[in-house]
Amino acid sequence: ALVTGLLPAILCKEKKESYTQPKVQFIKAIKSTISNKPFVFLTMTFICCLIGTFIISPLTLYILIYHVAEGDKSFGALLSGLGGWGFSVFQIILSRPTASLGNRWGKRNVLCLGIIIMASGYLLSWFLYTPNYPWLSIIPLPIMCIGSLCIYLLHGAMVADICDIDELESGFRRQGIFAAVTQFVYKSSIALSS
């Protein structure tokens, strides 16, 4: 793994234009990044989805054990494990089709569709988390997976598109500051929802 990780660092060279680009001050770069309206809108959407997901997800195990499984910890854990397994399998299977749909229908449209699908999965959990039919509680997680996959997969691609638009407008290639702000927002959202 170390060798394959080092090969791109050794063999791939940057373009010469990046060396001649004048340095931009950090505060000025942050201000211009935050003033980019498409980036702010995309980031706010990302924040809302992240905080919503990370606040609700830890409660799912407790709901499955104490409501759906009526206190049976092993059965509740089994339901949670099967749901998590389905979530992971669906993400692996649907990664390529989601990327293809993003290219065909437009990333924004697929992202909006994914958010709607994820919200419908959360709404379905209100009706499918029932002690009468406990196996139905597995259904919402793969549905939520589709929306989650759209958010995580297309968000990065959309930030790259915003970097390209910003370069056309400003003349500077500033994907580093966009990536830094995105990761700061991501980690802050997780910390805020913990």
Where are these regions (language model features)?
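Membrane-embedded alpha-helical bundles of multi-pass transporters/translocases
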Residues: A1-S194
